[in-house]
Curated annotation (Swiss-Prot):
Endpoints of the signal sequence: none
Principal localisation: plastid
Gene name for this UniProt entry: PPT2
Gene Ontology MF term list: phosphoenolpyruvate:phosphate antiporter activity; phosphoglycerate transmembrane transporter activity
Tissue: Widely expressed in leaves throughout development. In flowers, expressed in sepals and pistils.
Superkingdom assignment: Eukaryota
Keyword Transport: yes
PANTHER family hit by this protein: SOLUTE CARRIER FAMILY 35 (PTHR11132)
Family: Belongs to the TPT transporter family. PPT (TC 2.A.7.9) subfamily.
Transit peptide: 1-55
Name recorded for this polypeptide: Phosphoenolpyruvate/phosphate translocator 2, chloroplastic
Length: 383
């Protein structure tokens, strides 16, 4: 028995020696069994096949891992560069725009000019085929017009606020955007927030309230305009989310481009109605008599328009590369960068309580972003 076990390592399979001695069979049957794939030692072909499978799965895996690692590094560097450009364009836009509004207090005209710069840049983009032209149906156009109205009012009200109060204060108030995002998502989409999201809104509201009470440049027009811009901008974002669900939805860049063009068309007659026709040599002369030459005024106005469209375009490009939650965190950091740079450039006086209020509001925005990340994180499931 021991000898049989030694000769046959697998006791379940009959030993070849045992078969040879105990089973009488003809030479023809032995020959046919030798050439039969089903009867001849079934473990050997499987071992060879498994070894082949192991090699073919191992070698490309190492090569592919290196490609993925280098690809992720390139993508990370590209994304980091785009975030840097986004922040830099925001800083320059707020600096140029504030200097223009200081000497030329016509926010509707300024906003229309800036949207006109964006419209020209979009036309160049489509003519040079840098991005495919959009195709949309009449039913989609109706929804896009609604988005354009919200976009127009958001930009106009932001410029009204920037013309009345400090840049840092306007952006502190605009840190309230998550509050209105949650509110409008409940009203328009029926999406109820989690407890963590509601808790993260408390420091935002408290911080903005403290910063408002201690703001040296506070006035009600500037405050209410910034707050109203939060409502219109977040209405646009929530409606965009609803619009982008369909299979025939436009991509982010084309959607933003069409919204910009329609906003420009809507705002030109509105600017004439609100401000009057203020693009005359006499009005420009009055504006330049307050510290800027005609050349400086024109260059700053043009650069503000280019920076506005460029940073919004880059923002949409980043949104296509990352999740909305990551984009929200980046937007929070952007506010910190813009507020800090504007305080340093314009030498804005800031009290300790004002600083605490601003920091509290921005910390709340960051907590909101983290709470959103927890909410959207899927539960792992075994497949």
């Amino acid at each position: 028995m021991f000898a049989l076990t030694f000769l046959n390592p697998n006791p379940r399979l009959p030993s070849p020696l045992f078969l040879a001695k105990s089973t009488p069979e003809s030479a023809l049957s032995r020959r046919s069994r030798a050439f039969s794939s089903s009867n001849s030692y079934p473990w050997r072909p499987n071992l060879r096949f498994n070894g082949f499978k192991l090699k073919s799965a191992t070698v490309p895996e190492n090569v592919e891992g290196g490609d993925l690692e280098s690809g992720s590094l390139v993508k990370g560097l590209k994304l980091g560069g785009m975030f840097g450009v986004w922040y830099l364009l925001n800083i320059y836009y707020n600096i140029f725009n504030k200097q223009v509004l200081r000497v030329y207090p016509y926010p509707a005209t300024v906003t229309a000019f800036q949207l006109g710069c964006g419209t020209l840049m979009i036309a160049i983009m489509w003519l040079l085929k840098l991005h495919p032209r959009p195709k949309f149906s009449p039913s989609q156009f109706t929804v896009i017009v609604q988005l354009a109205v919200a976009h127009t009012l958001g930009n106009l009200l932001t410029n009204v606020s920037l013309g009345r109060v400090n840049v840092s204060f306007t952006h502190t108030i605009k840190a309230m955007e998550p509050f209105f995002t949650v509110l409008l998502s409940v009203l328009l989409l029926g999406e109820w927030p989690s407890l963590w999201i509601v808790c993260s809104l408390l420091p935002i509201v408290a911080g903005v309230s403290l910063a408002s009470f201690t703001e040296a440049s506070f006035n009600w027009i500037g405050f209410c305009s910034a707050m109203a811009s939060n409502v219109t901008n977040q209405s646009r974002n929530v409606l965009s989310k609803k619009f982008m669900v369909g299979k025939d939805a436009l991509d982010n860049i084309n959607l933003f481009s069409i919204i910009t063009i329609i906003s420009f068309i809507l705002l030109v007659p509105l600017a004439i109605l609100i401000d009057g026709f203020k693009v005359t040599p006499s009005h420009l002369q009055v504006a330049t008599s307050q510290g800027l030459s005609v050349k400086e005024f024109c260059i700053m106005s043009l650069l503000a328009g280019v920076c506005l469209h460029s940073y919004q375009q880059v923002s949409y490009m980043i949104l296509e590369m990352v999740s909305p939650v990551t984009h929200s965190v980046g937007n929070c950091v952007k506010r910190v960068v813009v507020i800090t740079s504007s305080i340093l450039f314009f030498k804005t006086p800031v009290s300790p309580l004002n600083s605490i209020g601003t920091a509290t509001a921005l910390a709340g925005v960051y907590l909101y972003s983290r709470a959103k990340r927890v909410q959207v994180k899927p539960n792992p499931k075994m497949s």
